[in-house]
Amino acid sequence: VIPICISTVNGKGLPVLLESIKQYAPEAFVYLRGTERVVSGYKNARLIFGEPRNFGEDYNEIIDDALKYAQACIVCNDDVVLTPNSYQRLLEDVEVIRELEINVGWVGARSDYVRPAQNIRYNPDGDHLEMCRFKSEQFIRHANNIAPIFAYISRDAWHHGRFPPLNWFSDDVSCADLNNQGYQHFVSSAYVHHVGSQTTGDDSKQLVAASVPWVKEHRPQYVKHFFGS
């Protein structure tokens, strides 16, 4: 059974997220990181207490812990809500992709608040709606970048693509590092609802600017691609 890894700052969305896991993926063990004040009441999870630092460092800690025991995990934002088949569909798609005998990096669910490649509003083929969704939503799609709001990663891939100590662009760095080592990323046909912007806020200029110094120092080869200059 593949565990689910969650790190939280204020825990605002946790009750709904954890209830959706309980109802729709009760077999999945949950690893949860946050302050003792926020997460200590959740007894049916492995808890790691810690003050919030940034997305990358906080998730590195909880994922590293899970992958001591599991061969893979699902990285999950603290403000998503599963549907009845989110967990099962994601893992079914992973098995399909693994049959291609390639190095699999991130495999991420679709959502309503996420980057274009995973966004259910993204309709590059101009599909018509069928039963309230685009036909393309049922297919697995290759992607250069995955936002891990609900995303699978194997232990092997993780050790080649851990997050940097950033909020924004932590996923960009992980995906690019893995791409450069021959891993490929995919969008699953699975779906989760995502509230979004509950922790870092929605000041995109400030969030981008905060990431630039680290990327310039540690991944200068990505600067033009990430920031356009």
Show which residues each predicted segment covers.
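C-terminal catalytic/acceptor-binding lobe
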Residues: P164-S229
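N-proximal low-complexity "stem/linker" segments adjacent to membrane-targeting elements
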Residues: V1-S20
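Short beta-strand-to-loop acidic/aromatic patch adjacent to the donor-nucleotide binding site
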Residues: A70-V81
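Glycine-rich, basic loop-to-helix element that forms the pyrophosphate-binding segment
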Residues: G50-A66
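Short, acidic, metal-binding catalytic loop of nucleotide-sugar glycosyltransferases
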Residues: E19-A28
